[in-house]
């Protein structure tokens, strides 16, 4: 045994946790130790004064756990009181200690806090009992220390009293009132309290004697030496274990020996003046103790409500002992005299409440960090070994439980899938109902069906972009941009419905040819039937008419569009592919028509000159192609078609087709005849008798008529030219829609062979690795060009390492960035090198967001990294020590700055992940967070970085 100076271990390393106690026969439980307060009752003999007054004994003791009133006053019987132990007047103090306090006192040697205090009315024997308990505890503690040779113990002694709510240090009587402070590690502590290191057993007994001599004592009518203050003796025990005998460094615990002052009545003690003031303070503090015990007993020791610890300094100091980290024993002392029956009952009520209070005692270990880590590793290894080799008797039971759990999980997954299917079905039905109501209000039945519109589901912004791209590069990039949207609804599309939509688009294409045919018929009649214009213009019109007829023959398809439920998609695809040459021929023919119209426009000046050279008599009979009063209706007869995706335009076109009849041409002709007859009447009636002046007037009128006709013809030809141009665009758009549907059909067939393709892809890991590296390099470069958030780059780079399942995410990310780069290039903002300081629009906002993000990361350098880590990073990234703030900014500005340097990319990802805590959370980040979303953007507030850039996808 060695008793010396205390070990200077910081209190921050005190670990209060259950642990196996080396060198002890008893092992603490594997969880927090919860136990009731040990409550015992000790009844003293009658005092000489009580015997002289012939006072009677009012209590009986049926056994060692029960006390019952004799009811000598013939009051209402209260019944027996049961406790852990009940000691009658014949029991000695040593027996009280052995059965009611010894186990609690010795637990302090094993690192568990312990408290023993006496409670009772004045002159009931509290101080007498606590003196014997203290002496026996000191003897037992030193006896156990002598037997425990593998540990070194250090004891510290301190004592205080609470006199009139004033805390006084009993080891330093010259000290004034001491303050109580709250310490986050120790709890409530007494400021400037003296703590003596105990040298040996005799030294400890000397200190105890000194403390008792310094305590406040006074005389009352009931007791010559009545304690006028609450005394608390605290013994701190730190037991250090040798390095080779255990896993923990040392145990640290406190033993509190509390001698409370007794409750008293002024009528019995005959107190006045100072004694009366002392008694009032004593009663007030004991009342607070009673309230705390009652509150704790009602909640089972758990602090579910407010516990009034701060109402008294006594309860504040003993807060941990009354319901916290401590083992507690309460010895309630009683006077057996009948004259003190009321106070004895109050004491028994207090004891009854106290035995319901639960404390949570724990082992307080002072552990070195390395030893604690080693101990925890051993504990983990032990638990893993137990898991690997479980109890054979429990294995079948566990196996059956696992099977049952798996069965339940599988059943729940099936139910979830069924619910999802029902949800999707309900949503589709709701969408169908909504679209059907819109169609009833005026939509065209020849337009795309509800299901196909839902499958394509393009936003108006997407259609504008697609319209612009169709005019330059129709089939390639737009198709790639739409395939992602088509895949989302491929599985839910009926094959027969797809074939039906293809046929309807072809019928629309055929109707466009009919419109062109009708327009050229009007123009042909204008030039051929009425012999207006030169011979070249007439031949040009005839050529146009023959080419349109040929176009109709090429694009002719059967009128049957009713498809059976089980239509062959493969046959339809083969038929469409065979028509690809016809589509190309159709476009070539339209180009020829365009050139012919241009030639016709070039003929107009020559026609005008030839008309001027002719004489007026030869032009007596002229029929204008259109009534001049109806010139404003020409755009209604020859109308430029609208977009095929517009329901309103479809209604206009189909209305013209349905309402157009053969008499329409006759109406035009009759209008022209009536107009010409009105003009030619004077010329025809008096041809021979005309004077030269009248002939000259007629010649002027004919020139005016020719000029008016020329203007009308020019307007008609320009209308046809614009119409043919628009017709080309509509044919292209129809062809594009057919390609979309064909892609959707091919996607259906591709899904059937998805499993085979997966097997093939698994068989070639080397090729996939090369593709992965190439795609990732492209994505990194596009990140740099599009000013993508650094956090998004880091998360994407660290999540996708080349697993075959990452292919879809890389493809989606690459397409999204490609689209964004093309969109910015279309605005003239392809890269920051071209922007300089004059960035505008979305590029400028993205650059601003990226700058704000770098400033945010620079602030986190000091908070997330210690000085050593920061210095290592500065050296690694070659940052000169010009200043702390500048170095942080230089470090952050170098992150993700070189997309061609993969080492820079890897190091940047590691630094950003450490700064944002991406690598510290330990949680699984879902890869689905990077999937491409085609729905409309929400109104939620976006964060800096990728969210701002991702909003560009919905332009």
UniProtKB/Swiss-Prot annotation:
Query: What does the induction field say?
Result: During the M phase of the cell cycle (at protein level).
> SUPFAM superfamilies from the xrefs?
P-loop containing nucleoside triphosphate hydrolases
Q: Provide a Gene Ontology MF annotation, just one.
A: microtubule motor activity
Question: Which portions of this protein are annotated as coiled-coil regions?
Answer: 366-443, 566-604
Q: Which GO terms describe its biological process?
A: cell plate assembly; microtubule-based movement
Question: Kinesin motor domain location, by residue?
Answer: 36-357
Subcellular compartments: Cytoplasm; Nucleus; Cytoplasm, Cytoskeleton, Phragmoplast
Q: Which domain of life is it from?
A: Eukaryota
Keyword vocabulary terms for this entry: ATP-binding, Cell cycle, Cell division, Coiled coil, Cytoplasm, Cytoskeleton, Microtubule, Motor protein, Nucleotide-binding, Nucleus
Q: Which residues bind ATP?
A: 120-127
Q: Report the main location listed first in the record.
A: cytoplasm
GO CC annotations, alphabetized = microtubule; nucleus; phragmoplast
Q: What exactly does this protein do?
A: Probable plus end-directed motor protein that may function in the NACK-PQR (NPK1-NQK1/MEK1-NRK1) MAP kinase signaling pathway, which is essential for somatic cell cytokinesis, especially for the cell-plate formation and its expansion. May regulate the activity and the localization of NPK1, probably by association through the non-catalytic region of the kinase.
Q: Would you identify the family this protein belongs to, as annotated?
A: Belongs to the TRAFAC class myosin-kinesin ATPase superfamily. Kinesin family. KIN-7 subfamily.
Q: What is this protein called?
A: Kinesin-like protein NACK2
Q: Which gene encodes it?
A: NACK2
